[in-house]
Amino acid sequence: MYTRIISTGTYLPEKVLTNDELEKIVNTSDDWIRSRTGIESRHIAADGEFTSHLAEKAAYKALEAAGLVPADIDLIVVGTCTPDRMFPNVACLLQERMGITGPAFSLEAACSGFVYALTVADQFLCSGKSKRALVIGAETMSRLIDWTDRETCVLFGDGAGAVILEASDKPGLLYSDLGADGQHRKLLYTETGLSNMESSVEGHLKMKGNEVFKVAVRTLESICLLYTSPSPRD
């Protein structure tokens, strides 16, 4: 049994924050941001617009593109680290609004959240537990941003992307590899927590961008070499 992506959907909030506008907030410039990231602007969720709202709009676009209705879905998996609330999770909020039945849960894996969600959904379908999954990556990162920190505020925005993943007799989703390395936890994190009783601390995102980039490149390189087995000549 295989799985394949049969449609996609996206949603970006209406508000756009350009590099020129950021120049008025923090010590940066359009040239500095473009040369290091390629980013020209980012979208920002409106007041009262939450992660579940972004996810829902992307989900309906994916359904429309596939010619399906919510009742055709029997699994929802969402990757997000900016949920509306601790619980119910974003997937369950979508389930209630869209009238979908079956398993519904969210995964917290930061930047790799959608990849984790897609891989888990793939395993559900390959095992025969589900037939058609709605998989979403959605974030409202602007709620975590310190707009005086140019290491982070220039990089992140808000948005959602969704795919419909379907069981198939032919290969579609070919391969995925999940991993984590907790020793780098201080390279990208937020202080705010619940069980650690630090919920009163400002929850701004903190990141050592150069180090995150180095770790990501090394890890991706090693995975590619491991699973493609290139020759020395390659």
Where do the protein language model's features map onto the residues?
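Conserved small/polar residues in nucleotide/adenosyl-binding loops
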Residues: 227-234
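Short, well-ordered amphipathic alpha-helical segments that serve as non-catalytic structural scaffolds
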Residues: 29, 51-66, 90, 216-226
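Conserved catalytic cysteine-centered active-site region
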Residues: 34-53, 80-133
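Flexible, glycine-rich active-site loops centered on histidine and acidic residues
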Residues: 126-160
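Acidic, glycine-rich active-site loops and adjacent beta-strand->loop/helix elements
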Residues: 11, 79-84, 110-112, 137-142, ...
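Condensing-enzyme catalytic core mediating Claisen C-C bond formation in acyl metabolism
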Residues: 1-47, 149-214, 218, 222
